[in-house]
């Protein structure tokens, strides 16, 4: 993974990490992935504390009804909304990289994003960003052609949409060379390896499910652009947006702690804006 590029169209330059003397960062989560979480109020509770929602749009989860419900939740909470496309693989929740032709993948991504855009248009809502899900997210980090396929799908729908990718990944430069704006993402609730990759979820300590630990990591990222790796080494990561995973146990409590600690540290939590 190429680390910490100087990115021409990066939001760290367009928006800035500072507005005046105020540090700013976005707080995002993946929403609308489970009808059960929508029904029991879990997504609604999490939505209270984030500023951007990545909405499942049919590839790994979600349908027209859940998209509409999630968009309405976002409207009620003044949360910016984005598309969360994946490999077309509902059976595996988009967690496995599929070996399919690039043209088919690009068309699938475009179809997923377009479906959410159509639902949003009916509700008079604008889709601000696109963040790939699961295996597609990591494939974009590793494979330039897959990143280009995603970028071209976004360009064909709305070239003003922001594409979210992992901070330090070469995919951000690929999106920028296509003419897209990008947002570099870091993770409040995931452990980092010394090379800057996320710790495998199958290993102990991969997920920071303590609100205090996640909030401390978020503050370090938001104020200093630094995070401690599992080895104890300090990594430098410049991020425009922080992610809290909705499937992390106690995700709403984590998001609340992150937002409160960021505010206490003088960081304004503000949504991505196209």
Regions found by a protein language model. Name each.
Residues 30, 84, 130, 244:
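Conserved, mostly hydrophobic/aromatic
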Residues 35-68:
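A short alpha/beta connector and helix-capping loop motif
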Residues 39-40, 62-73, 141-145, 168-175:
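Active-site-adjacent beta->alpha loops and helix N-cap segments on the catalytic face
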Residues 45-48, 70-82, 121:
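Acidic (Asp/Glu)-rich catalytic clusters
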Residues 55-60, 139, 160-167:
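Catalytic beta/alpha-barrel core
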Residues 90-123:
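Glycine/small-residue-rich loop that forms an oxyanion/phosphate-binding "nest" at active or ligand-binding sites
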Residues 161, 253-274:
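C-terminal domain-boundary segment and adjacent tail
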Residues 170, 174, 178-226:
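Active-site rim beta-loop-alpha module in soluble metabolic enzymes
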């Amino acid at each position: 993974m190429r680390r910490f590029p100087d990115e021409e169209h990066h939001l760290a330059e367009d928006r800035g990490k500072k507005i005046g003397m105020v540090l700013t960062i976005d707080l995002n989560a993946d929403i609308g992935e489970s009808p059960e979480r929508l029904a029991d109020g879990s997504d609604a509770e999490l939505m209270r504390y984030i500023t951007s929602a990545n909405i499942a749009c049919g590839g790994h989860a979600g349908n027209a009804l859940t998209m509409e419900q999630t968009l309405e939740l976002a409207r009620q909470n003044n949360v910016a909304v984005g598309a969360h496309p994946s490999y077309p693989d509902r059976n595996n929740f988009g967690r496995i990289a599929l070996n399919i032709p690039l043209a088919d993948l690009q068309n699938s991504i475009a179809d997923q994003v377009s479906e959410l855009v159509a639902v949003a248009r009916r509700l008079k809502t604008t889709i601000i960003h696109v963040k790939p899900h699961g295996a597609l997210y990591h494939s974009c980090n590793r494979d330039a052609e897959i990143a280009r396929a995603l970028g071209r799908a976004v360009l064909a729908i709305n070239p003003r949409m922001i594409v979210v990718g992992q901070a330090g990944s070469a995919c951000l430069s690929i999106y920028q060379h296509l003419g897209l704006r990008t947002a570099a993402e870091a993770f409040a609730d995931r452990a980092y390896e010394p090379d800057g990759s996320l710790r495998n979820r199958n290993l102990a300590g991969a997920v920071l499910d303590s609100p205090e630990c996640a909030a401390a990591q978020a503050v370090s990222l938001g104020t200093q652009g630094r995070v401690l790796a599992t080895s104890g080494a300090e990594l430098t990561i410049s991020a425009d947006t922080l992610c809290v995973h909705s499937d992390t146990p106690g995700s709403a409590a984590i998001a609340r702690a992150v937002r409160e600690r960021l505010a206490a540290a003088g960081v304004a939590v503000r949504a991505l804006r196209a």
